[in-house]
Curated annotation (Swiss-Prot):
This is Phosphomethylpyrimidine synthase. Keywords: 4Fe-4S, Iron, Iron-sulfur, Lyase, Metal-binding, S-adenosyl-L-methionine, Thiamine biosynthesis, Zinc. It comes from Shewanella halifaxensis (strain HAW-EB4). Zn(2+) binds at residues 433, 497. GO terms for cellular component: cytosol. Catalyzes the synthesis of the hydroxymethylpyrimidine phosphate (HMP-P) moiety of thiamine from aminoimidazole ribotide (AIR) in a radical S-adenosyl-L-methionine (SAM)-dependent reaction. Its EC number is 4.1.99.17. Belongs to the ThiC family. It catalyses: 5-amino-1-(5-phospho-beta-D-ribosyl)imidazole + S-adenosyl-L-methionine = 4-amino-2-methyl-5-(phosphooxymethyl)pyrimidine + CO + 5'-deoxyadenosine + formate + L-methionine + 3 H(+). It comes from the Bacteria. InterPro entries: ThiC (IPR037509), ThiC-associated_dom (IPR025747), ThiC/Bza_core_dom (IPR038521), ThiC/BzaA/B (IPR002817). The keyword rRNA-binding does not apply.
Length: 662
């Protein structure tokens, strides 16, 4: 069997046998909202107790409460869920949409292309089997979350988000876990706690979006904005030369397991329409697309043959399928294209290069820019959010922050204000390849030019010397720009610039970017961000190995790395690891020092010995003569040498050997 067939067969087997997957020692829980049908899915990580005293026969333990964390996996992490990818996920938002009374179910699809696909019997074997007619706003109605927010309405989606973003912070009362630095937010104002009203205000202001198409009721509400947790997007999608529908559905499920807050389907190969339907119906997270890719397929890949009519039909096709946000390269203007001529790497955005070629071949202004108000009308009818694409982003650090890049950003700032006139939720896409010293300028200019609309960046990649490791080179920039105020990061995988990512690449990219996003949250001072860090640090200091693994982003890898060096069962409770060994573990030594100090204090209290303060000890030391100090040091030195000049002695060695023999 060829590698391609084998990969496809494995993907088919995966989705045929798909069962909910849970991380070790975790369970799916639901936090109840103000109404019966508002239940917010979270992951709860259970921890072992801490030994605080007693003896071998009567140990005394202190409980470590379970930790609640954000969970993007929807039904895929719920053992009680009945998953069938051929039927799709439960449409749990359907009732919320219907009860608002401002949408209607159409008799059939509106897109001419979709009508052609449905009439083609040759596609029956590929088609998602449980298709329903799409919804659209009633005449003269706007159905966007931005519209509701501006009307002062707190939707169920907004309440869901508030509960989710807080991560049960109010339940955590251990000062060890709640301690945090106030952070440096660079002007971001984060609610503490985050309330439904705060969510509404941020959406109404345009500082945050809730990307939820009315035709994607399976999606769980989430928010993108700099005053909330930094989000991460994963890219999937087939191409003309590789991947299949089965593989893309597998990658979707895999992405949500490892923390993708949104997923972009960047398919460019055959069966784009059918692949997208399977993805949306099985996605608990918002789905984004770049519609120009499919429009180009419809004109046989010839950019010059693109036109507004084809693109418009593509927007309606995708909106009625349930796409939650469109990337639109409307800022690539004819007059900006010559600005890229002296660049080292020219135009590297696929969508940007398509529109640049169209502009030059027709010597006309970008038709996406010319028809931008028409695009907004379509988006407003389905609550599709706009992600204004950065077609002029730099493809090398040599081209960073140049005239072309910032000219386009200025235009995007103008377009976002037009979108807001139509109550269309909008975010701004950013670079790209930017050295560390130029990253903050990008964030500052975006906030200024785009009136604080959320920023969504690809990296940025901070150096160009590491093909195969660009998840690292870009993760550095991603952490920095997340701290400065970026709302969502688009992941980069190890295959960036080299090939289409597989499952393992997707995982590596997501873990890298979840680290970057979390580091940004901690640095900004997000109220609930550092709790998980503190819990893991406490587990590490107390040598609760299983809790260390399970509180981390990737428990399986952490456990495998530890067991690779110390596979014995006894090593899972030992107070050292293979890095330093039993004699040089700094945390073990610290614990021994603490125990010694505590025992000494108890002895002094028992014997009525006056316990001096640090200042009193210093006063005594100051009164000693130099000769007295030297004599004391000499005596201690002689005692150390008499015992063999060993840092650790037989008792500690015997204790360690006993642990390893268990």
């Amino acid at each position: 069997m060829s590698n391609r067939r084998e990969t496809r067969a494995q993907a088919q087997q995966f989705i045929d046998n798909l069962k909910p997957l849970q991380h070790p020692n975790s369970e799916k829980i639901y936090l109840q909202g103000s109404r019966a049908d508002l239940k917010v899915g979270m992951r709860q990580i259970h921890q072992a107790d801490t030994l605080i005293g007693g003896n071998e026969t009567n140990p005394v333990f202190e409980a470590n409460p379970p930790l609640k964390v954000y969970d993007c996996a929807g039904a895929y992490s719920d053992p009680d869920a009945n998953i069938d990818v051929r039927k799709g996920l439960e449409k749990f938002r359907e009732h919320w949409i219907e009860e608002r009374g401002d949408t209607e179910q159409l008799a059939g699809v509106s897109s001419g292309f979709t009508q052609q696909r449905l009439a083609d019997d040759g596609l029956d074997h590929l088609r998602f089997e449980s298709l329903l007619p799409p919804r659209r706003a009633k005449t003269a109605k706007r159905v966007t979350q931005l519209h509701y927010a501006r009307q002062g309405i707190i939707t169920p989606e907004m309440e869901y988000i508030a509960i989710r973003e807080n991560m049960a912070l109010a339940e955590v009362n251990d000062p060890i876990l709640t301690q945090k630095d106030k952070g440096e937010s660079f002007g971001a104002v984060i609610g503490e706690p985050i309330t439904p009203e705060f969510v509404r205000q941020e959406v109404a202001r345009g500082r945050a979006i809730i990307p939820l198409n009315i035709n994607h009721p399976e999606a769980e509400p989430m928010i993108i904005g700099r005053n909330f947790l930094v989000k991460v997007n994963a890219n999937i999608g087939n191409s003309a030369v590789t991947s299949s529908i089965e593989e893309e559905v597998e990658k979707l499920v895999w992405s949500t397991r490892w923390g993708a807050d949104t997923v972009m389907d960047l398919s460019t190969g055959r069966y784009i329409h059918e692949t997208r339907e399977w993805i949306i119906r099985n996605s608990p997270v918002p789905i984004g697309t770049v519609p120009i890719y499919q429009a180009l397929e419809k004109v046989n890949g010839i950019a010059e043959d693109l036109n507004w009519e084809t693109f418009r039909d593509t927007l309606i096709e995708q909106a009625e399928q349930g796409v939650d946000y469109f990337t639109i390269h409307a800022g690539v203007l004819l007059r900006y294209v010559p600005m890229t001529a002296k660049r080292l790497t020219g135009i590297v955005s696929r969508g940007g290069s398509i529109m640049a070629k169209w502009c030059l071949s027709h010597h006309k202004e970008n038709f996406l820019y010319e028809h931008f108000r028409d695009i907004c009308e379509i988006c407003a009818a389905y609550d599709v959010s706009l992600s204004l694409g950065d077609g002029m982003r730099p493809g090398s650090i040599a081209d960073a922050n140049d005239e072309a890049q910032f000219s386009e950003l200025t235009t995007l700032g103008e377009l976002v204000k037009i979108a807001w006139q139509y109550d269309v939720q909008t975010i701004i896409e950013g670079p790209g390849h930017i050295p560390m010293n130029l990253i903050k300028e990008n964030m500052d200019k975006q906030l200024e030019l785009c009136d604080e609309a959320p920023f969504y960046t690809l990296g940025p990649q901070t150096t160009d010397i590491a093909p195969g490791y660009d998840h690292f080179t870009s993760g550095i920039g991603a952490a920095m720009i997340a701290w400065y105020g970026c709302a969502m990061l688009c992941y980069v995988t190890p295959k960036e610039h080299l090939g289409l990512p597989n499952k393992e690449d997707v995982k590596q990219g997501l873990i890298t970017y979840k680290i970057a996003a979390h580091a940004g949250d901690v640095a900004k001072g997000h109220p609930s961000a550092q709790i998980r860090d503190n819990a893991l640090s406490k587990a590490r200091f107390e040598f609760r190995w299983e809790d260390q693994y399970n509180l981390g982003l990737d428990p399986d890898t952490a456990r495998a790395y530890h067991d690779e060096s110390l596979p014995q069962e006894s090593a899972k409770v030992a107070h050292f690891c293979s890095m330093c060994g039993p004699k040089f573990c700094s945390m073990k030594i610290t614990q021994e020092v603490r125990d010694y100090a505590a025992a000494k204090e108890r002895d002094e209290l028992a014997n009525n010995i006056d316990i001096k303060s640090d200042a009193e000890y210093q006063s005594c030391a100051d009164s000693e003569t130099t000769s007295e100090r030297e004599l004391g040091m000499a005596q201690m030195s002689a005692e150390f040498k008499a015992k063999g000049a060993e840092l650790y002695h037989e008792a500690a060695d015997k204790q360690r050997d006993a642990v390893l023999e268990d």
